[in-house]
């Protein structure tokens, strides 16, 4: 063997080793697990992220995602209870496979488990839902419930068939319906919109009328309250005037009563003082003072009884009687029957 052949052999060996290494070394991304098949049999030990070595051409691997992933089911036919065929353009299923369940699910449903457990189940559940409802219900009335119904149905079956596979959310696009039916629905929606607008306008008008009525009621109540307040104010003014008049009358009556009491008290005191002051001796003194201050002289038979006390008058009367007895009868009485003193007084 010459040098050229030796070099070719070495190059062939190196190339074969390189090919074998390239075929045996593989990389697993983060969030994935690698399951291995050797001779078609699934090995029991999956590998995590990183570089791994396997027997080339004997062992193969499949990468299985264990983080959130979205599976899309497109153009799903669906027949309603009325016989109308509709198509749902896209259904998105957000799911996640737990790492501990990778081996069992891959063994039972292969590495393409989503086609068996999700895609087929979506078709089945959606057709059941459509066949039980009319086009009106599927397209309008119950469309918002399709997502939740599909999610619950999928998760219920997966809990039994594939524990560890969780459905996070289901999103369904609006169904495609025949063009003629779609136009009818659009016209119906337009009419419904007009009806809603008319109803809203009517509600607005009713609300405005109600607001106007409440405003009128409030205004009337305000006027009534103002009138009531003014009336109460006038009543209070009249009551105040009446009270003031009563107070003034009471004050005047009290003053008059006090004045009358004072006058009565003064008169009573004056009478009491006079009672104590006007004794017989004092009256006698005042009488003599009055006689002494009087410059007129009175003559007559009644003078002694007027200005002389009774004792003096009796003495004077007794003396005069004795003198008359000693006089002759002619001298004792004049022809006229009057005394000489009276005649002199009359003459004078």
From Swiss-Prot:
Subcellular location: Endoplasmic reticulum membrane
Protein modification: Deubiquitinated by USP25; leading to stabilization.
Modified residues (N6-acetyllysine): 269
Residues on Cytoplasmic side: 1-7
SMART domains according to UniProt: PHB
Chief location category: endoplasmic reticulum
Membrane topology: Single-pass type II membrane protein
Composition bias type Basic and acidic residues, residue spans: 318-336
Matching Pfam families: Band_7 (PF01145)
A GO CC term attached to the entry: endoplasmic reticulum membrane
Keywords of this entry: Acetylation, Cholesterol metabolism, Endoplasmic reticulum, Glycoprotein, Lipid metabolism, Lipid-binding, Membrane, Signal-anchor, Steroid metabolism, Sterol metabolism, Transmembrane, Transmembrane helix
TM stretches of this protein: 8-28
Region of interest: Disordered: 318-348
Comp. bias regions, Polar residues: 339-348
GO aspect biological process, one term: negative regulation of fatty acid biosynthetic process
Residues of this chain annotated as glycosylated in UniProt: 108
Topology Lumenal: residue spans: 29-348
Annotated S-S bridges: none
Annotated family: Belongs to the band 7/mec-2 family.
Subunit note: Forms a heteromeric complex with ERLIN2. In complex with ERLIN2, interacts with RNF170. Interacts with AMFR and SYVN1.
PANTHER family: ERLIN (ER LIPID RAFT ASSOCIATED PROTEIN) HOMOLOG, ERLIN-1
Protein task: Component of the ERLIN1/ERLIN2 complex which mediates the endoplasmic reticulum-associated degradation (ERAD) of inositol 1,4,5-trisphosphate receptors (IP3Rs). Involved in regulation of cellular cholesterol homeostasis by regulation the SREBP signaling pathway. Binds cholesterol and may promote ER retention of the SCAP-SREBF complex.
Name this polypeptide is given: Erlin-1
Provenance organism: Mus musculus (Mouse)
Lineage: Eukaryota, Metazoa, Chordata, Craniata, Vertebrata
Gene: Erlin1
């Amino acid at each position: 063997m010459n040098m050229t052949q030796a070099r070719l052999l070495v190059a062939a060996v190196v190339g074969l080793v390189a090919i074998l290494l390239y075929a045996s070394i593989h990389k697993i991304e983060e969030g994935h697990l690698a399951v291995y098949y050797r001779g078609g049999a699934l090995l029991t030990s999956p590998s995590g992220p990183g570089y791994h070595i396997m027997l080339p051409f004997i062992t193969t691997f499949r990468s299985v995602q264990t983080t959130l992933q979205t599976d899309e089911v497109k153009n799903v036919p669906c027949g309603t209870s009325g016989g109308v065929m509709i198509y749902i353009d896209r259904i998105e299923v957000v799911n996640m496979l737990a790492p501990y369940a990778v081996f069992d699910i891959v063994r039972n449903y292969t590495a393409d488990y989503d086609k068996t457990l999700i895609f087929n189940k979506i078709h089945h559940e959606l057709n059941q839902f459509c066949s039980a409802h009319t086009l009106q219900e599927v397209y309008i009335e119950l469309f918002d419930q399709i997502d939740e119904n599909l999610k619950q149905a999928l998760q219920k079956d997966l809990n039994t068939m594939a524990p560890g596979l969780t459905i996070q959310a289901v999103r369904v696009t609006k169904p495609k319906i025949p063009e003629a039916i779609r136009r009818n629905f659009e016209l119906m929606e337009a009419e419904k919109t007009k009806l809603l607008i008319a109803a809203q306008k009517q509600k607005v008008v009713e609300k405005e009328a109600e607001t106007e009525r409440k405003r009128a009621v409030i205004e009337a109540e305000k006027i009534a309250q103002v009138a009531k307040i003014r009336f109460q104010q006038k009543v209070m003014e009249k009551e105040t005037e009446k009270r003031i008049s009563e107070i003034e009358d009471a004050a005047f009556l009290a003053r008059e009563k006090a004045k009358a009491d004072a006058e009565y008290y003064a008169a009573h005191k004056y009478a009491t003082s006079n009672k104590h002051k006007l004794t017989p001796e004092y009256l006698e003194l005042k009488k003599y003072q009055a006689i002494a201050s009087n410059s007129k002289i009175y003559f007559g038979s009644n003078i002694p009884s007027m200005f002389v006390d009774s004792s003096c008058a009796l003495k004077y009367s007794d003396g005069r009687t004795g003198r008359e007895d000693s006089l002759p009868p002619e001298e004792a009485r004049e022809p006229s029957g009057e005394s000489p003193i009276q005649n002199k007084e009359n003459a004078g």
